[in-house]
Amino acid sequence: MFLGTHSPRLDEKGRIILPAKFREELASGLVLTRGQERCIYVFSEREFGRIHEQMREAPISSKQTRDYIRVFLSGASDEVPDKQGRVTIPPALRAYAGLGRELAVIGAGSRAEIWDAQAWNEYLAEKETSFSETDDAIPGIF
């Protein structure tokens, strides 16, 4: 499970050092893809395979389904961390997420997310305000 917030930097070659807590689960390989809110989703290969199977079950007669699958999968990149735990983020994904040098890598349960640090701080400041009322809006979460 991916938890916490980490603050790595993007190096000049477009690489990020994965948080130590995430490396074991991602050591054999991972998939980077576009996420909502202009972040990058990071899935273990196993979790991405599970998600892909769910997508295969979705009705392709739905235009919305086809559009989502195209955008989600066309931006995906499978990567293997090097011995130092570094992963290269493809230029197209860096541009999509507007990544600068300072990053925020957050745990989101079954996935991690890579954000530009400023974008994450702005998002968090906006969402924390309503966080205390969220349990009323999402019954059964606790």
From Swiss-Prot:
The keyword 4Fe-4S does not apply. Its main location: cytoplasm. Pfam families: MraZ. SUPFAM superfamilies: AbrB/MazE/MraZ-like. InterPro entries: MraZ (IPR003444), MraZ_C (IPR035644), MraZ_dom (IPR020603), MraZ_N (IPR035642), MraZ_sf (IPR038619), SpoVT-AbrB_dom (IPR007159), SpoVT-AbrB_sf (IPR037914). It comes from the Bacteria. PROSITE patterns: SPOVT_ABRB. Forms oligomers. Belongs to the MraZ family. This is Transcriptional regulator MraZ. It comes from Arthrobacter sp. (strain FB24).
